Amino acid sequence: MNDWYESTRADYASKGLGSRSGYGIKPALLIVDFSNGFTDSTSPLGGDFDRQVAVTARLLTVFRDGQLPVVFTTVAYEPDFRDAGVFIKKVPSLSILLQGSHLVEIDDRIAPLKGESVIVNK
């Protein structure tokens, strides 16, 4: 695998691709899909993510104390799934993630504060 990686990096470099842009001057915290549907162990899609939620809560405290941007994402579908595209056919178990249900809300242990964005992805 290392040979593949090195050859890919060399190919990218020869084409002027793969440069780094740095970290910028204002970091943001993006919390992806820490909704009840995934973090609640009683959910059909859930697991034991207590440790991950606890670590995320610590990160949230740091970002909020520093007044840095925090953005959450969740997966949510309309009841008729017209917004689901073909992905719902690939992963039909996601059909329990309906807009307005408890399962698509962000876990209360890291709940968004007023002004923090929640992006619904499909």
Task: Go through each PLM region and give its residues.
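Active-site acidic carboxylates
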Residues: M1-S117
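Alpha-helical scaffold elements lining the catalytic groove of polysaccharide deacetylases
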Residues: V120-K122
